[in-house]
Curated annotation (Swiss-Prot):
Keywords: Coiled coil, Transit peptide. This is Coiled-coil domain-containing protein 70. Residues 129-168 form a coiled coil. One of its GO terms (cellular component) is plasma membrane. The gene is CCDC70.
Amino acid sequence: MFSFKVSRWMGLACFRSLVTSSPSIRQKKLMHKLQEEKAFREEMKIFREKIEDFREEMWTFRGKIRAFRGQILGFWEEERPFWEEEKSFWKEEKSFWEMEKSFREEEKTFWKKYRIFWKDDKAFWKEDNALWEKDRNLLQEDKALWEEEKALWVEERALLEEEKALWEDKTSLWEEENALWEEERAFWVESNGHIAREQMLEELHNANRGRRSLAFSRGRA
């Protein structure tokens, strides 16, 4: 397209040399047209320079793109293990959140059981305290009964001592009584008393011995 315009402008320049004898109005128009074309050629030259500059910038930017692409590829190769680890981490994180959800459910169940246990434990210790108070009162009563039993045992022991002394007195009395009967029997024998009298004394003596045996059995009871 640019070569066609250049050829056209060259043709117009040749045509301008041929029409030097034309009227002034037409010549003025041609001069104005030539000035416009000259200005346009200057603008075209400037634009062509801009095109070249843009092309250089484009190639520079393309080089930057290639360099950046190389950096991206290198970064991808270097970061690939990281992305694999990150992928594995997200899987582990998902498993962790599922485990946490299960744990929260177990925790909820545990605290529910704990509240029930604490309530039962409170009731148990309340009942245990009541039983302890009851046992303490029973212990005090047992202690009082034991003191009474101890005093009763002391009294019983004193009574046994008295009964023993009484039994010793009775034994001494029976011995004296037997000695008296023996002396009396000897007296009647020496005095050659009547047989009937002796028999009567013997029966009386046996009767007295029977009474002593009965008294002895009562004393031991």
